[in-house]
């Protein structure tokens, strides 16, 4: 709905215009009025740690001249889409319900409960009264404009991933394993939509490949090639390699730059951690196998991309969170924009 009300898909300027308002609450803090992607957002008077914002937009309807009266619909869906996009673009939490923001962003009270709260897993995103600069608001506007300018299918693909990304944050207090897997789902969904990688024999698991190569020596070459062709069509192999190639291809060099007080994943560790994240998601999806104990502990996550255990490297929740943000942002700006007047 948010994309539709911009008038992008209408072929006539003969329209009804409906000035609409809604309220969103957030831990993000800024003042004034901002125009961002066909929407105005204005800070309202705040009486607590969570700030209210008035969202204003024009819910446009093209006149049909059919003799039937058109009824304005979709305000709830518009706010749902907007809260998710703002949450992603401003790296914060937006919601129609103030108590939801307070619950997600709450701090752990001393001596209460042994389970960590979401804010202990990721740094900055869930800070109360998180200051947002003018430049950050402008960047948010640029992102929203780019997203709204995509064709309908691309817009829905990206929006669905952003919704899943935000759902992952909300799941942190309930099930860290599911929250972690949800981030991997985001990457998988994008990979399946935008990558057409075709696996080759060298992609096959090394141990199985070596064992088969010994058997192949006893078979004629033509038969060997046919068998290899069947094996590399294995769906799991295809999905796994597509996932890896897509993510690596949408992570820029700046992602690996040094940051003070944070352990950043190295380029040589990245693919190993990525493969492990994919396997963790697979085990959770098929066997409900939870994350290893260390990855469920917030102290390993907040200020480090990766955790090393038994000579292996794993993404922490916050590390994987950074990867997903990077990939969603980069794929959004890599997609072609379509002009107004395009068909749905």
Task: Go through each PLM region and give its residues.
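Amphipathic, oligomerization/interface secondary-structure segments
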Residues: 21, 149-344
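Charged, non-catalytic interaction/linker regions at domain boundaries
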Residues: 1-181, 185, 306-343
